[in-house]
Amino acid sequence: MSQPKKSLSSLLAPYLTLDPAAERMIGAITTDNRQLDADTLWLAARGVSHHALDYYTPDLPAAAIAYEPPYANPPAGAIPCECLSEHLGDIAARFYDDPSQALDIIGVTGTDGKSSLVHFLAQATGGAMLGTIGYGTLDALEAASHTTPDPLRIQQHLAQYRDAGITTVAMEVSSHALAQHRVGGIRFRIGVFTNLSRDHLDYHHDMEDYFLAKARLFAQPLPVAVINIDDA
């Protein structure tokens, strides 16, 4: 999908003051060095075991590089942005003109029942869904790569749904996605909590950490919260 170009400063302004000499017009954003073009902003974040800049080579095309410090010997002209991995969703939302502001988004979290409930909600509302079953409307589902996609892809999907005239989106919000800030930049209309049982403790270490990750969905102001209090 084609987006109007945005100034680099408008995308990064909340996190840093950009040198006027570094201003650029940005036509695309990515976290993947294989998707770079001459008008692309490369958001080079730190991962679990590698930093995106580990894959930098001088011949990579990019309008600008924003990277998450610390990183030894970043490329000349690369812009340090503290906690970049936590801001990816917000940056993507600004690039795509805040699509969640035009949508009623229902976020569903919990150990069990997310996929079924999101599918039922998409059926009931005639809207789109994002989850394990797929991404899109029920008559045109795209295969899912993750329960909750990466933050840039989420915002791209939401912008597509907005531009197609869709008004409601039901999405699975996994504990991994919440812990990794993948749903940053999304204004949820409704938050739903299905249940909590032992799962993903290889990632969350204990039940308290797992619960706190799920609870992040409800940390933002929600017009409506639906919480299952009897899972018998």
What are these regions (language model features)?
Residues 1-90:
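N-terminal leader/targeting and accessory segments in enzymes
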Residues 47-50, 82, 111, 148, ...:
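Short, surface-exposed acidic/glycine-rich loop or hinge patches that mediate macromolecular interfaces
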Residues 54-58, 181-182, 232:
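A short acidic, amphipathic alpha-helical/loop segment
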Residues 69, 229-231:
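Helix N-cap/beta->alpha junction signal
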Residues 88-229:
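Phosphate-binding loop of NTP-binding sites
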